[in-house]
Structures are given as C-alpha cells and as structure tokens.
C-alpha cells in the first residue's frame, strides 16, 4: 500500500492529457490550476498549435489561449469533473493513499485535484490527469481475477486494510463514477466494468440491474451489453464499455460529456436537471436529433416501467467528437426498491413534475417530437416487450421465486406508474409481468 500522508496536502495543479479522435496515445492539452476554491484551465500552446486539436468540450472550454474560469456556481469545469471518481472511487483512494478505513473514510474531505491525480488512468471518456506536462505515466493495475477484485471490494467496504496485491488490483477502478463497489477488467477486444454487491444491499441489486439492462435491449433501446457471472458464490455484473475501441496498435478512447455538464450544473444543483431540458439540448446540439429524441423518450418510459428512479443527470451522456454530440448507449438502469407505491424520478420529467407515472411521460411527449398517439403506442410496445421477455430474462438471471415476486410489480410495472394514464394503458398494467 502507498505510504499514508496528510489529507490536507492538496495539489495545486494537474495537467490534462487527451486522446484525440482516432488516436491510441495521449497528448497534453493543458493545465488545471487552483485559485482559492476555484480551478482554472488553460490550454497549452503546443496543443493550440496542433492542426488536429479539438476543444475538450465547447462551449465550456473553447479552444483559445488564456485562463478559462469554471462556469458560475462550479469550482471545476464540468467536462473535467466528468472524469473524476465518485463515492466508491473516493473510498478506495482514502483507503489506499490516506489509510482511512470504513467509517473513518470521509469522502467529502478529498479535494478534486487529489481525486483526479490519485485515481486510475483508464477512466471514462478520453481524458487523464497527470503531474507532468512532458511525461505521461499511466496509473494502471496489474491483472487480477474477478474473485480477487470482489475480495478487495469487500475489504474496502468493511474497512479492512488491503494487501499490496489487492490494493493494486482495485486501484484500476477508482476513476469510475457511482457509489457502488466496482472494478474494471479487460476481456480480449473489450473492456468491461465489473459491478459487485454491497454489504448494505437489502435485495439483489446486481441481478436487478442485469434484468433491467437485458429487458431494455429487448425493448429496442440502445443499451450497453451486459452479462452475469457467478464468482465465489456471489453475483457479478459485467457491463461492456462503449467508450473504448480496440484497434491494431492499441485502444482508442471516445470522449464523453454527462448531461450534468450539458446543463452546467454540479451535484448540488442536479435537482434542476430535466428530461425536458435534455430534449431541448438534443434538438440543438446532437446528431440525428429526431431519432435521438425518440430514443430518450423510450429510456424515460423504460426507467419508469422498471422502477429506476436513479436516473440522475450523470446517468445520461453524449459522445463528443470535438464538434458534435451523439447520445451514448443507456447504462446504469438499476431498479430501486420502494417503501410505498409512489415514486419520483431523479430528473424532472416536464415542468416541475417528477412523479414516476406514464401520464407525465405522455404530457412530456411533444418535447420529444411525438404526438399523443405515437407516444401511447411506444409505451404499449414497451409494456408488451417486458411481458414477452420476462420469463426468458428471469431465467437468464436465475432469479428465485422470491426475487421474481419482488422485481415484478414492486419494481417492474408497479401499479403506481399507470395512475392517470389512458384506460388502454391501464389495462396493460393489470397483470403480473410474467
């Protein structure tokens, strides 16, 4: 394990390296420098002089000289923050670098530059963060089995010190977002995110996400491919990464921008993010806007039908090629357990409404270039698809009878989602998913 040091020794700067479109090696793009609580970015002249230079993200970081401050209300440009770890990665960093374990691991004590520089290099998107503008040193992990990664994740959750081998194995996944235990693995010509169960789970979250992702794909949505593995008697979800492309001389990286960054918000302001606002951004800034709007409407509907209320703005993203945005495949579709029937989405649906109902989807439909008839048909098709594929996907997941009963009608096709919907849709919600 890395020797422990004071958490107050925060770095003053970091250098941003970027994989340009179609390239397999990074180049330095610029520097982040701290100025009080805010962090400014400026492009390096060598990068500005490149004929193939692209803005990290425009309009937030336009390709120009001089220090660029973060947008109002932000301490760091959102497109840079998108590459930082979230709760799980920060727990691993606290364990690894500062020796803080279990309940002593206050992730709020970590500053952003520390998180960027102490997390793994194979982060989501096309950026990495280094201490040097001249020499790129990849922070990668040694090869580890899923069993070893699972063991390491459990130890971090329990606050148990890691051996150097387990510490290095888990380090690779520190740059991933989200709060749940996870790691990254390489599988020949694919890269995968491995998601593990948590000690605080009250139901099989891994299986519920697998079922939702498989049903989303069968419903015609563009969703990241997934598979379920059994390791050391526990379920592990493997999600194929869509921001990596294997070519003859290495890996290309695809830049990604979260919807939170599109909105110019941070986590404290995320409650203002909305599907309505994302639809407007798609109309003006995304490739194939009409088809993309229909896809997003489908994802909204499916999130409600499957009980995924964790559809916050970091769980939507677009590929960025330096000029245009293209919606990424759907990811992190994970049904949430609810105590009562009523539920609300993390993102507003239309106006100030966020209740998880099909009626709200229908009200929002015009923002997705769908009339009432087309929207209702789309919803009916999804309900039919869930019913038709339910048994098959439940068998793929090897769900127990108890799990089927919990997932069906508590998460998937919960009666609450049909309240206020047209009778034709309400009639489709009268039976169990099976």
Regions found by a protein language model. Give the residues of each.
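Phosphate/dinucleotide-binding and metal-coordinating scaffold of catalytic cores
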Residues: 1-313, 317-434
């Amino acid at each position: 394990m890395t020797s422990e040091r004071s958490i107050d020794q925060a770095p003053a700067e970091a250098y941003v390296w970027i994989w340009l479109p179609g390239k397999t090696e990074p180049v330095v793009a610029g520097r982040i420098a701290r100025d009080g609580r805010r962090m400014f970015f400026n492009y390096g002249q060598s990068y500005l002089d490149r004929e193939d230079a692209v803005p990290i993200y425009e309009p937030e970081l336009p390709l120009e000289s001089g220090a660029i401050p973060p947008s109002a209300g932000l301490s760091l440009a959102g497109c840079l923050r998108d590459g930082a770890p979230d709760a799980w990665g920060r727990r691993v960093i606290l364990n690894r670098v500062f020796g803080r374990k279990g309940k002593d691991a206050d992730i709020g004590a970590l500053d952003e530059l520390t998180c960027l520089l102490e997390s793994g290099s194979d982060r989501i998107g096309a950026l990495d963060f280094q201490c040097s503008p001249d020499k790129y040193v990849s922070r990668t992990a040694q090869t580890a089995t899923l069993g070893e990664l699972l063991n390491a994740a459990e130890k971090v959750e329990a606050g148990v010190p890691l051996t150097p081998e387990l510490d290095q194995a888990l380090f690779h996944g520190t740059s991933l977002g989200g709060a749940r235990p996870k790691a990254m693995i390489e599988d020949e010509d694919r890269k995968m995110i491995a998601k593990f169960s948590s000690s605080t789970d009250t139901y099989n979250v891994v299986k519920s996400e697998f079922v939702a992702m498989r049903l989303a794909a069968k419903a015609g949505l563009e969703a990241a491919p997934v598979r379920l593995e059994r390791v050391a008697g526990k379920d592990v979800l493997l999600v194929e990464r869509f921001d990596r492309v294997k070519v003859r001389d290495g890996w290309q990286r695809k830049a990604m921008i979260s919807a939170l960054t599109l909105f110019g918000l941070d986590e404290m302001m995320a409650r203002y993010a909305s599907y309505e606002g994302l639809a407007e951004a798609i109309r003006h800034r995304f490739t194939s806007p009409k088809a993309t709007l229909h896809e997003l409407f489908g994802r909204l509907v499916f999130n409600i039908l499957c009980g995924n209320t964790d559809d916050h703005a970091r769980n939507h993203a677009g590929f960025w090629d330096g000029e245009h945005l293209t919606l990424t495949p759907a990811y992190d579709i994970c049904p949430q357990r609810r105590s009562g029937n009523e539920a609300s989405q993390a993102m507003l649906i239309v106006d100030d409404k966020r209740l998880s109902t099909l009626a709200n989807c229908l009200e929002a439909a015009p923002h997705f270039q769908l009339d009432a008839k087309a929207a209702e048909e789309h919803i009916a098709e999804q309900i039919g698809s869930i019913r038709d594929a339910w048994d098959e996907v439940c068998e793929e997941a090897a769900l127990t009878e108890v799990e089927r009963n919990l997932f069906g009608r508590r998460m998937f096709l919960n009666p609450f989602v049909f309240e206020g919907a047209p009778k034709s849709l309400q009639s489709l919600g009268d039976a169990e998913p099976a």
